C-alpha cells in the first residue's frame, strides 16, 4: 500500500482490514453501532436571521426496533453514495443539495487469458494479473471509459433496494479468476435527468435499476456483445461464461439503458478493439446495469466544511466530494482538520 502505484487488498481480505479498523476506533474510545439507522435531524434556529444549527439526531436500532435521540451539535455525515433514505431525509430537513453528474453503463467480461496476452505477451503467466484502462470520445462528444477494472474478478449483484438491480465488480487478493471484468460507463448529467431538483439523479438511477430488475426477474441481466449490437436477446454463451456473485439470466441489456448511453457503449467497445485485440468479440459479455459509480447528489458546504445547517459536516463519496476510497479518506482528513482547528 505504501509503495505500489495501484495497491490491491482484495475483497476477501478487506473484511478483516475493516474489522481491525473498528477495533482501533474502539481502543481510542470510539463506539461503533451496527444496524443503527440515521432517521432525521433535529434543527433549531440560531436567532440570527435564517441561520439554523444542528441540535440532535434521531436514530433507530433496526435489530431491537428501538428509537433514540442523540444530542449532537456536530455531525460528520460520511455516508455512502447509495444512502438514498438519508438523501430523502436531508432534503426534507432543508439541507441544501444539488443534483450531480455521474456515470452509468454495464460490466463487461472477457477471458483473463486474452487480456493477459494482449497486455504482456506470451510470458503473461509470469507477471501480475493484467489490467487495463480505456477511454473513448464518441462522435456525439460523450466520454466512454473503463471504471473499477477487476482483474481475475467477479461481477456482483450489488442491489440495495427492493425491486431494483445494480451491479459492481470485485477481485479477491489473488486475482485468480478466469475472467477480467470492468465497468464501461458513460457520463450523464442534469440534461439527461427528468428534472433539475436535488434528487433528480437519484430518480434517474432508480428508473433504470427497476428496468434492470424487471428484465431478468431479479437476476443479473447478461447479453453477448454481438446480440447487443443486433438489439436481440442472447440464446447461448460463446467462449466466455459469466463469473458472478449472483445468478444471471439472458436479457436485452440494450433496453435497460438510455438510448444515448447504449449507443455510446457500442461505439466505445468497438473502438477499444484498436487497443486490445479481441475486446469487441461477439461473445464478450455485457451485464447490467452499473449505475452507482458516484453519488447522484452533492450536499452543499462552505469553506468551514459545514452545510447550511451549522454543525453538519457532509464529507466523502456520498456527499459528492470524493470518487473512491483514497479521495474519500482525504476528504475525511480535511474535515477533521477543520473541526479541530488543525490540531
List PLM regions with ranges:
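Residues forming the flavin
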Residues: 1-343
